[in-house]
Amino acid sequence: MSQQHTLPVTLPAALSQKLLDTVPPPVNTQQEQRKQPAPLPPPCQKVPVELPVEVLSKHEEKHMTIVKGVPEQECEQQQPQEQELQQQHWEQDKEHQKAENPEQQLKQEKVQREKQQLQGQLEEEKKLLDQQLDQELAKRDEQLGTKKEQLLEFPEQQEGQLKHLEQEEGHLELPEQQEGQLKNLEHQEKPLELPEQQEGQLKHLEQQEKPLELPEQQEGQLKHLEQQEGQSELPEQQRGQPKYLEQEEGQLKHLEEQKGQLKHLEHEEGQLELPEQVGQPKHLEQLEKQLEHPEQQEGQLKHLEEEEGQVKHLGEQEEQLKHLEQQEEQLKHLEQQEGQLEHLEQQEGQLKHLEQHEGQLELPEQQVGQSKHLEQEEKQLEHPEQQEGQLKHLGKQKAQLELTEQVGQPKHLEQQEKQLEHPQQQEEQLKPQEQQEGQLKDLEQQERQLEQPVFASAPGQVQDIQQALPPKGEVLLPVEQQQQKQEVQGQHE
Protein backbone atom coordinates (compact mmCIF):
# COMPACT_ATOMS: atom_id res chain seq x y z
CA MET A 1 0.00 0.00 0.00
CA SER A 2 1.42 3.27 -1.05
CA GLN A 3 1.02 6.09 1.33
CA GLN A 4 -1.23 8.94 0.16
CA HIS A 5 -0.03 12.45 0.80
CA THR A 6 -2.69 15.15 1.30
CA LEU A 7 -1.67 18.64 0.31
CA PRO A 8 -3.56 21.90 1.02
CA VAL A 9 -5.34 23.09 -2.08
CA THR A 10 -6.11 26.79 -2.66
CA LEU A 11 -9.07 27.39 -4.91
CA PRO A 12 -9.12 30.28 -7.34
CA ALA A 13 -11.35 33.36 -6.77
CA ALA A 14 -13.98 32.32 -9.30
CA LEU A 15 -14.68 29.00 -7.56
CA SER A 16 -14.86 30.62 -4.13
CA GLN A 17 -17.37 33.13 -5.51
CA LYS A 18 -19.56 30.35 -6.92
CA LEU A 19 -19.62 28.58 -3.59
CA LEU A 20 -20.65 31.74 -1.83
CA ASP A 21 -23.39 32.48 -4.37
CA THR A 22 -24.95 29.06 -3.76
CA VAL A 23 -25.79 30.08 -0.19
CA PRO A 24 -29.43 31.37 -0.18
CA PRO A 25 -29.85 34.99 0.99
CA PRO A 26 -32.44 35.97 3.66
CA VAL A 27 -36.10 36.48 2.80
CA ASN A 28 -36.11 40.32 3.02
CA THR A 29 -33.37 40.85 0.45
CA GLN A 30 -34.42 38.33 -2.20
CA GLN A 31 -36.54 40.76 -4.22
CA GLU A 32 -33.87 43.47 -4.24
CA GLN A 33 -31.21 41.01 -5.43
CA ARG A 34 -33.44 39.84 -8.24
CA LYS A 35 -34.06 43.41 -9.43
CA GLN A 36 -30.42 44.50 -9.24
CA PRO A 37 -27.67 41.95 -9.80
CA ALA A 38 -24.85 42.22 -7.32
CA PRO A 39 -21.63 43.64 -8.83
CA LEU A 40 -18.60 41.41 -8.97
CA PRO A 41 -16.24 42.02 -6.06
CA PRO A 42 -12.80 43.37 -6.87
CA PRO A 43 -9.77 41.43 -5.74
CA CYS A 44 -8.78 41.49 -2.07
CA GLN A 45 -12.41 42.28 -1.09
CA LYS A 46 -14.69 40.35 1.20
CA VAL A 47 -18.05 39.49 -0.34
CA PRO A 48 -20.89 40.89 1.89
CA VAL A 49 -23.15 37.88 2.43
CA GLU A 50 -25.62 37.63 5.29
CA LEU A 51 -24.66 34.31 6.86
CA PRO A 52 -24.00 33.23 10.40
CA VAL A 53 -20.66 34.22 11.81
CA GLU A 54 -19.42 30.65 12.04
CA VAL A 55 -20.14 29.85 8.38
CA LEU A 56 -18.47 33.05 7.21
CA SER A 57 -15.39 32.39 9.24
CA LYS A 58 -15.07 28.86 7.79
CA HIS A 59 -15.52 29.98 4.23
CA GLU A 60 -13.06 32.80 4.69
CA GLU A 61 -10.47 30.42 6.01
CA LYS A 62 -10.97 27.94 3.16
CA HIS A 63 -11.63 30.10 0.17
CA MET A 64 -9.68 33.29 0.78
CA THR A 65 -7.13 33.58 -1.98
CA ILE A 66 -4.49 36.21 -2.44
CA VAL A 67 -4.19 37.63 -5.90
CA LYS A 68 -0.62 38.06 -6.84
CA GLY A 69 0.53 41.38 -8.22
CA VAL A 70 -2.21 43.54 -6.50
CA PRO A 71 -0.68 45.97 -4.00
CA GLU A 72 -2.29 46.87 -0.66
CA GLN A 73 -2.78 50.54 -1.62
CA GLU A 74 -5.31 49.58 -4.34
CA CYS A 75 -7.31 47.65 -1.75
CA GLU A 76 -7.42 50.71 0.50
CA GLN A 77 -8.64 52.86 -2.41
CA GLN A 78 -11.48 50.39 -3.04
CA GLN A 79 -12.92 50.85 0.50
CA PRO A 80 -14.62 54.25 -0.17
CA GLN A 81 -16.26 52.69 -3.23
CA GLU A 82 -17.74 50.04 -0.96
CA GLN A 83 -19.19 52.74 1.31
CA GLU A 84 -20.83 54.51 -1.65
CA LEU A 85 -22.43 51.26 -2.77
CA GLN A 86 -23.79 50.68 0.72
CA GLN A 87 -25.28 54.20 0.83
CA GLN A 88 -27.01 53.64 -2.52
CA HIS A 89 -28.37 50.38 -1.18
CA TRP A 90 -29.81 52.15 1.91
CA GLU A 91 -31.39 54.89 -0.21
CA GLN A 92 -33.10 52.30 -2.39
CA ASP A 93 -34.45 50.62 0.74
CA LYS A 94 -35.88 53.96 1.95
CA GLU A 95 -37.61 54.64 -1.37
CA HIS A 96 -39.08 51.16 -1.31
CA GLN A 97 -40.42 51.73 2.23
CA LYS A 98 -41.95 55.08 1.19
CA ALA A 99 -43.79 53.42 -1.68
CA GLU A 100 -45.13 50.78 0.70
CA ASN A 101 -46.16 53.31 3.45
CA PRO A 102 -47.76 56.44 1.86
CA GLU A 103 -49.44 57.36 5.17
CA GLN A 104 -46.10 57.83 6.91
CA GLN A 105 -44.92 59.96 4.02
CA LEU A 106 -48.00 62.20 4.33
CA LYS A 107 -47.44 62.56 8.07
CA GLN A 108 -43.85 63.54 7.52
CA GLU A 109 -44.89 66.12 4.93
CA LYS A 110 -47.43 67.60 7.37
CA VAL A 111 -44.80 67.80 10.08
CA GLN A 112 -42.44 69.58 7.72
CA ARG A 113 -45.17 72.06 6.71
CA GLU A 114 -45.98 72.80 10.35
CA LYS A 115 -42.30 73.38 11.05
CA GLN A 116 -42.08 75.80 8.13
CA GLN A 117 -45.20 77.67 9.33
CA LEU A 118 -43.80 77.94 12.86
CA GLN A 119 -40.51 79.23 11.52
CA GLY A 120 -42.35 81.86 9.45
CA GLN A 121 -44.38 82.98 12.49
CA LEU A 122 -41.24 83.21 14.61
CA GLU A 123 -39.54 85.33 11.97
CA GLU A 124 -42.55 87.69 11.78
CA GLU A 125 -42.64 88.04 15.57
CA LYS A 126 -38.92 88.80 15.61
CA LYS A 127 -39.42 91.49 12.98
CA LEU A 128 -42.27 93.08 14.98
CA LEU A 129 -40.20 93.04 18.16
CA ASP A 130 -37.27 94.61 16.34
CA GLN A 131 -39.54 97.37 15.00
CA GLN A 132 -40.97 98.07 18.46
CA LEU A 133 -37.49 98.21 19.97
CA ASP A 134 -36.34 100.59 17.24
CA GLN A 135 -39.34 102.87 17.88
CA GLU A 136 -38.73 102.91 21.64
CA LEU A 137 -35.05 103.64 21.14
CA ALA A 138 -35.88 106.46 18.74
CA LYS A 139 -38.30 108.00 21.27
CA ARG A 140 -35.71 107.78 24.05
CA ASP A 141 -33.10 109.34 21.80
CA GLU A 142 -35.48 112.23 21.04
CA GLN A 143 -36.20 112.77 24.74
CA LEU A 144 -32.49 112.73 25.58
CA GLY A 145 -31.79 115.13 22.72
CA THR A 146 -34.40 117.60 23.96
CA LYS A 147 -33.00 117.42 27.50
CA LYS A 148 -29.47 117.96 26.23
CA GLU A 149 -30.62 120.94 24.19
CA GLN A 150 -32.30 122.43 27.25
CA LEU A 151 -29.15 121.89 29.31
CA LEU A 152 -26.96 123.34 26.58
CA GLU A 153 -29.11 126.46 26.25
CA PHE A 154 -27.98 127.73 29.66
CA PRO A 155 -24.22 127.42 28.98
CA GLU A 156 -24.69 129.20 25.63
CA GLN A 157 -26.49 132.06 27.33
CA GLN A 158 -23.74 132.25 29.93
CA GLU A 159 -21.06 132.26 27.23
CA GLY A 160 -22.81 135.22 25.60
CA GLN A 161 -22.91 137.02 28.94
CA LEU A 162 -19.20 136.29 29.51
CA LYS A 163 -18.28 137.70 26.11
CA HIS A 164 -20.33 140.78 26.88
CA LEU A 165 -18.55 141.16 30.23
CA GLU A 166 -15.14 140.72 28.59
CA GLN A 167 -15.99 143.51 26.19
CA GLU A 168 -16.96 145.69 29.13
CA GLU A 169 -13.68 144.86 30.88
CA GLY A 170 -11.82 145.82 27.70
CA HIS A 171 -13.58 149.16 27.76
CA LEU A 172 -12.74 149.58 31.43
CA GLU A 173 -9.02 148.98 30.85
CA LEU A 174 -8.73 152.30 29.03
CA PRO A 175 -9.88 154.39 32.00
CA GLU A 176 -7.40 152.51 34.22
CA GLN A 177 -4.55 153.28 31.84
CA GLN A 178 -5.64 156.89 31.73
CA GLU A 179 -5.59 157.01 35.52
CA GLY A 180 -2.00 155.75 35.55
CA GLN A 181 -0.99 158.30 32.96
CA LEU A 182 -2.68 161.08 34.87
CA LYS A 183 -0.87 160.12 38.07
CA ASN A 184 2.45 160.09 36.22
CA LEU A 185 1.67 163.50 34.76
CA GLU A 186 0.86 164.81 38.21
CA HIS A 187 4.30 163.76 39.48
CA GLN A 188 6.12 165.18 36.47
CA GLU A 189 4.01 168.30 36.01
CA LYS A 190 3.46 169.69 39.47
CA PRO A 191 2.47 173.10 38.19
CA LEU A 192 -0.08 171.53 35.83
CA GLU A 193 -2.49 170.10 38.41
CA LEU A 194 -5.74 168.67 37.27
CA PRO A 195 -8.92 170.57 38.06
CA GLU A 196 -11.22 169.41 40.82
CA GLN A 197 -13.77 168.21 38.27
CA GLN A 198 -11.35 165.56 36.94
CA GLU A 199 -10.68 164.21 40.41
CA GLY A 200 -14.43 163.90 41.00
CA GLN A 201 -14.81 162.07 37.71
CA LEU A 202 -12.01 159.63 38.57
CA LYS A 203 -13.64 158.83 41.91
CA HIS A 204 -16.92 158.31 40.10
CA LEU A 205 -15.20 155.87 37.69
CA GLU A 206 -13.72 153.91 40.60
CA GLN A 207 -17.15 153.63 42.19
CA GLN A 208 -18.60 152.36 38.90
CA GLU A 209 -15.85 149.78 38.42
CA LYS A 210 -16.52 148.22 41.83
CA PRO A 211 -20.15 147.15 41.13
CA LEU A 212 -19.05 145.64 37.82
CA GLU A 213 -16.87 142.99 39.47
CA LEU A 214 -17.74 139.39 38.67
CA PRO A 215 -18.24 138.00 42.22
CA GLU A 216 -20.97 140.56 42.83
CA GLN A 217 -22.50 139.72 39.45
CA GLN A 218 -22.60 136.06 40.44
CA GLU A 219 -24.37 136.96 43.69
CA GLY A 220 -26.98 138.90 41.72
CA GLN A 221 -27.44 135.94 39.35
CA LEU A 222 -27.86 133.55 42.29
CA LYS A 223 -30.55 135.78 43.80
CA HIS A 224 -32.23 135.95 40.43
CA LEU A 225 -32.15 132.13 40.11
CA GLU A 226 -33.65 131.73 43.60
CA GLN A 227 -36.55 133.91 42.54
CA GLN A 228 -36.91 131.80 39.40
CA GLU A 229 -36.98 128.56 41.42
CA GLY A 230 -39.86 129.92 43.49
CA GLN A 231 -41.77 130.51 40.29
CA SER A 232 -40.53 127.21 38.69
CA GLU A 233 -40.91 128.48 35.15
CA LEU A 234 -38.15 128.70 32.55
CA PRO A 235 -39.73 131.44 30.35
CA GLU A 236 -39.65 133.85 33.30
CA GLN A 237 -35.88 133.40 33.53
CA GLN A 238 -35.59 134.71 30.02
CA ARG A 239 -37.76 137.70 30.93
CA GLY A 240 -35.39 138.68 33.75
CA GLN A 241 -32.35 138.64 31.46
CA PRO A 242 -33.39 141.59 29.20
CA LYS A 243 -33.66 143.87 32.25
CA TYR A 244 -30.16 142.89 33.35
CA LEU A 245 -28.83 143.55 29.83
CA GLU A 246 -30.55 146.94 29.73
CA GLN A 247 -28.82 147.91 32.97
CA GLU A 248 -25.45 146.89 31.53
CA GLU A 249 -26.09 148.90 28.35
CA GLY A 250 -26.88 151.97 30.45
CA GLN A 251 -23.63 151.55 32.36
CA LEU A 252 -21.68 151.22 29.09
CA LYS A 253 -23.21 154.42 27.72
CA HIS A 254 -22.24 156.21 30.91
CA LEU A 255 -18.65 154.91 30.57
CA GLU A 256 -18.47 156.11 26.97
CA GLU A 257 -19.53 159.58 28.07
CA GLN A 258 -16.78 159.55 30.69
CA LYS A 259 -14.24 158.48 28.06
CA GLY A 260 -15.24 161.45 25.92
CA GLN A 261 -14.73 163.75 28.89
CA LEU A 262 -11.27 162.26 29.56
CA LYS A 263 -10.24 162.77 25.94
CA HIS A 264 -11.38 166.36 26.18
CA LEU A 265 -9.27 166.84 29.31
CA GLU A 266 -6.23 165.28 27.65
CA HIS A 267 -6.65 167.65 24.75
CA GLU A 268 -6.69 170.59 27.14
CA GLU A 269 -3.60 169.29 28.92
CA GLY A 270 -1.79 168.99 25.59
CA GLN A 271 -2.45 172.64 24.93
CA LEU A 272 -1.14 173.63 28.36
CA GLU A 273 2.12 171.67 28.06
CA LEU A 274 5.39 173.66 27.86
CA PRO A 275 7.82 173.33 24.94
CA GLU A 276 10.29 171.63 27.28
CA GLN A 277 7.89 168.69 27.60
CA VAL A 278 8.40 167.57 23.99
CA GLY A 279 10.41 164.52 25.07
CA GLN A 280 7.73 163.35 27.53
CA PRO A 281 5.52 161.36 25.05
CA LYS A 282 8.23 158.77 24.49
CA HIS A 283 8.71 158.42 28.22
CA LEU A 284 4.97 158.04 28.69
CA GLU A 285 4.76 155.32 26.02
CA GLN A 286 7.48 153.33 27.77
CA LEU A 287 5.67 153.63 31.06
CA GLU A 288 2.41 152.52 29.45
CA LYS A 289 4.08 149.44 27.98
CA GLN A 290 5.49 148.55 31.38
CA LEU A 291 2.10 149.00 32.97
CA GLU A 292 0.31 146.83 30.37
CA HIS A 293 2.09 143.58 31.34
CA PRO A 294 1.12 143.41 35.03
CA GLU A 295 -2.39 144.49 34.17
CA GLN A 296 -2.66 141.70 31.59
CA GLN A 297 -1.46 139.16 34.13
CA GLU A 298 -3.96 140.38 36.66
CA GLY A 299 -6.69 140.25 34.01
CA GLN A 300 -5.78 136.65 33.15
CA LEU A 301 -5.89 135.62 36.80
CA LYS A 302 -9.26 137.25 37.21
CA HIS A 303 -10.47 135.53 34.05
CA LEU A 304 -9.39 132.12 35.38
CA GLU A 305 -11.13 132.74 38.68
CA GLU A 306 -14.24 133.78 36.80
CA GLU A 307 -14.20 130.57 34.73
CA GLU A 308 -13.90 128.45 37.89
CA GLY A 309 -16.83 130.29 39.42
CA GLN A 310 -18.82 129.75 36.22
CA VAL A 311 -18.13 125.99 36.26
CA LYS A 312 -19.48 125.82 39.82
CA HIS A 313 -22.43 127.90 38.74
CA LEU A 314 -23.17 125.45 35.88
CA GLY A 315 -23.19 122.53 38.34
CA GLU A 316 -25.66 124.40 40.53
CA GLN A 317 -27.86 125.10 37.51
CA GLU A 318 -27.92 121.40 36.58
CA GLU A 319 -29.11 120.57 40.10
CA GLN A 320 -31.74 123.26 39.76
CA LEU A 321 -32.94 121.71 36.49
CA LYS A 322 -33.32 118.33 38.18
CA HIS A 323 -35.29 119.99 40.97
CA LEU A 324 -37.54 121.69 38.41
CA GLU A 325 -38.21 118.36 36.65
CA GLN A 326 -39.27 116.85 39.98
CA GLN A 327 -41.60 119.81 40.55
CA GLU A 328 -43.16 119.29 37.10
CA GLU A 329 -43.86 115.64 37.96
CA GLN A 330 -45.48 116.73 41.24
CA LEU A 331 -47.65 119.24 39.35
CA LYS A 332 -48.84 116.49 36.99
CA HIS A 333 -49.73 114.33 40.00
CA LEU A 334 -51.67 117.22 41.56
CA GLU A 335 -53.59 117.77 38.31
CA GLN A 336 -54.63 114.12 38.34
CA GLN A 337 -55.82 114.46 41.93
CA GLU A 338 -57.82 117.58 41.00
CA GLY A 339 -59.56 115.63 38.24
CA GLN A 340 -60.47 112.92 40.77
CA LEU A 341 -61.84 115.56 43.18
CA GLU A 342 -64.03 117.02 40.44
CA HIS A 343 -65.39 113.56 39.72
CA LEU A 344 -66.18 113.07 43.42
CA GLU A 345 -67.96 116.44 43.58
CA GLN A 346 -70.13 115.40 40.66
CA GLN A 347 -71.03 112.19 42.47
CA GLU A 348 -71.91 114.15 45.63
CA GLY A 349 -74.22 116.40 43.61
CA GLN A 350 -75.97 113.32 42.21
CA LEU A 351 -76.41 111.90 45.74
CA LYS A 352 -77.95 115.17 46.94
CA HIS A 353 -80.35 115.10 44.02
CA LEU A 354 -81.36 111.53 44.92
CA GLU A 355 -81.91 112.50 48.56
CA GLN A 356 -84.22 115.35 47.51
CA HIS A 357 -86.15 112.99 45.30
CA GLU A 358 -86.40 110.48 48.16
CA GLY A 359 -87.73 113.21 50.48
CA GLN A 360 -90.47 113.95 47.96
CA LEU A 361 -91.42 110.27 47.78
CA GLU A 362 -91.58 109.83 51.58
CA LEU A 363 -94.75 111.91 52.03
CA PRO A 364 -97.11 109.80 49.87
CA GLU A 365 -95.80 106.58 51.46
CA GLN A 366 -96.47 107.93 54.95
CA GLN A 367 -99.97 108.89 53.88
CA VAL A 368 -100.59 105.38 52.56
CA GLY A 369 -99.63 103.80 55.90
CA GLN A 370 -101.79 106.26 57.84
CA SER A 371 -104.82 105.75 55.59
CA LYS A 372 -104.70 101.96 56.03
CA HIS A 373 -104.41 102.28 59.78
CA LEU A 374 -107.31 104.75 59.95
CA GLU A 375 -109.52 102.45 57.87
CA GLN A 376 -108.87 99.62 60.29
CA GLU A 377 -109.72 101.78 63.28
CA GLU A 378 -112.87 103.19 61.65
CA LYS A 379 -114.18 99.68 61.14
CA GLN A 380 -113.64 99.03 64.85
CA LEU A 381 -115.69 102.13 65.75
CA GLU A 382 -119.05 100.37 65.36
CA HIS A 383 -120.23 101.33 68.84
CA PRO A 384 -120.72 105.01 69.69
CA GLU A 385 -119.26 104.66 73.22
CA GLN A 386 -115.88 103.61 71.90
CA GLN A 387 -115.54 106.58 69.55
CA GLU A 388 -114.21 109.08 72.10
CA GLY A 389 -111.45 106.80 73.41
CA GLN A 390 -110.53 105.72 69.94
CA LEU A 391 -110.27 109.32 68.68
CA LYS A 392 -107.73 110.02 71.41
CA HIS A 393 -105.97 106.82 70.49
CA LEU A 394 -105.85 107.95 66.87
CA GLY A 395 -104.15 111.19 67.82
CA LYS A 396 -101.51 109.30 69.78
CA GLN A 397 -100.97 106.89 66.94
CA LYS A 398 -100.45 109.74 64.47
CA ALA A 399 -97.72 111.17 66.70
CA GLN A 400 -96.19 107.71 67.01
CA LEU A 401 -96.26 107.21 63.26
CA GLU A 402 -94.17 110.31 62.75
CA LEU A 403 -91.53 109.01 65.16
CA THR A 404 -91.49 105.46 63.77
CA GLU A 405 -91.25 106.70 60.21
CA GLN A 406 -88.21 108.73 61.15
CA VAL A 407 -86.62 105.62 62.70
CA GLY A 408 -87.37 103.39 59.70
CA GLN A 409 -86.22 105.93 57.13
CA PRO A 410 -82.73 104.43 56.49
CA LYS A 411 -84.11 101.07 55.37
CA HIS A 412 -86.81 102.83 53.44
CA LEU A 413 -84.25 105.06 51.72
CA GLU A 414 -82.23 102.05 50.61
CA GLN A 415 -85.34 100.51 49.08
CA GLN A 416 -86.13 103.78 47.33
CA GLU A 417 -82.61 104.01 45.91
CA LYS A 418 -83.00 100.54 44.44
CA GLN A 419 -86.38 101.53 43.03
CA LEU A 420 -85.02 104.76 41.53
CA GLU A 421 -82.65 102.79 39.35
CA HIS A 422 -85.60 101.65 37.21
CA PRO A 423 -87.80 104.44 35.75
CA GLN A 424 -90.66 101.99 35.06
CA GLN A 425 -90.97 101.22 38.77
CA GLN A 426 -91.23 104.96 39.50
CA GLU A 427 -94.18 105.30 37.15
CA GLU A 428 -95.89 102.35 38.84
CA GLN A 429 -95.32 103.98 42.25
CA LEU A 430 -96.89 107.27 41.16
CA LYS A 431 -100.17 105.60 40.17
CA PRO A 432 -101.03 104.33 43.68
CA GLN A 433 -100.10 107.76 45.08
CA GLU A 434 -102.95 109.36 43.16
CA GLN A 435 -105.33 106.73 44.53
CA GLN A 436 -104.04 107.42 48.05
CA GLU A 437 -104.83 111.13 47.77
CA GLY A 438 -108.48 110.28 47.02
CA GLN A 439 -108.58 107.89 49.98
CA LEU A 440 -107.17 110.58 52.30
CA LYS A 441 -109.99 112.93 51.38
CA ASP A 442 -112.53 110.22 52.27
CA LEU A 443 -110.79 109.65 55.60
CA GLU A 444 -110.96 113.33 56.48
CA GLN A 445 -114.74 113.26 55.90
CA GLN A 446 -115.07 110.18 58.14
CA GLU A 447 -113.06 111.86 60.93
CA ARG A 448 -115.40 114.84 60.83
CA GLN A 449 -118.35 112.48 61.25
CA LEU A 450 -116.64 110.79 64.21
CA GLU A 451 -116.14 114.13 65.97
CA GLN A 452 -119.93 114.44 66.39
CA PRO A 453 -121.36 113.86 69.98
CA VAL A 454 -121.25 110.29 71.22
CA PHE A 455 -123.99 108.60 73.32
CA ALA A 456 -122.81 106.80 76.46
CA SER A 457 -123.76 103.17 76.90
CA ALA A 458 -125.60 101.62 79.83
CA PRO A 459 -123.58 100.87 82.99
CA GLY A 460 -124.06 97.12 82.85
CA GLN A 461 -123.43 96.80 79.20
CA VAL A 462 -120.17 95.16 78.14
CA GLN A 463 -118.61 95.75 74.80
CA ASP A 464 -116.36 93.32 73.08
CA ILE A 465 -113.49 95.06 71.30
CA GLN A 466 -111.96 93.04 68.57
CA GLN A 467 -108.96 93.87 66.50
CA ALA A 468 -110.02 94.66 62.99
CA LEU A 469 -108.31 92.62 60.35
CA PRO A 470 -107.01 94.43 57.26
CA PRO A 471 -109.24 94.27 54.21
CA LYS A 472 -108.40 92.11 51.29
CA GLY A 473 -105.60 93.40 49.09
CA GLU A 474 -103.92 95.33 51.97
CA VAL A 475 -100.90 94.38 54.07
CA LEU A 476 -100.27 94.98 57.77
CA LEU A 477 -97.40 97.16 58.89
CA PRO A 478 -94.11 95.37 59.70
CA VAL A 479 -93.71 93.80 63.14
CA GLU A 480 -90.89 96.19 64.08
CA GLN A 481 -93.07 99.27 63.43
CA GLN A 482 -95.94 97.77 65.51
CA GLN A 483 -93.58 97.15 68.44
CA GLN A 484 -92.26 100.72 68.20
CA LYS A 485 -95.85 102.05 68.22
CA GLN A 486 -96.66 100.06 71.38
CA GLU A 487 -93.55 101.40 73.14
CA VAL A 488 -94.46 104.99 72.25
CA GLN A 489 -98.04 104.44 73.51
CA GLY A 490 -96.70 103.19 76.84
CA GLN A 491 -94.54 106.30 77.22
CA HIS A 492 -97.48 108.67 76.52
CA GLU A 493 -99.78 106.82 78.97
Curated annotation (Swiss-Prot):
Q: Which family does it belong to?
A: Belongs to the involucrin family.
Q: State the organism of origin.
A: Saguinus oedipus (Cotton-top tamarin)
Q: Composition bias, kind Low complexity: at what positions?
A: 76-89, 473-493
InterPro entries given for it? Involucrin_CS, Involucrin_N, Involucrin_rpt
The source's superkingdom equals Eukaryota
Q: Where in the cell is it found?
A: Cytoplasm
Q: Where is this region: Disordered?
A: 1-47, 60-123, 139-493
Per the record, the major location class is: cytoplasm
Mind telling me what this protein is named? Involucrin
Q: Give the Polar residues compositional bias ranges.
A: 228-240
PROSITE patterns this protein is in?
INVOLUCRIN
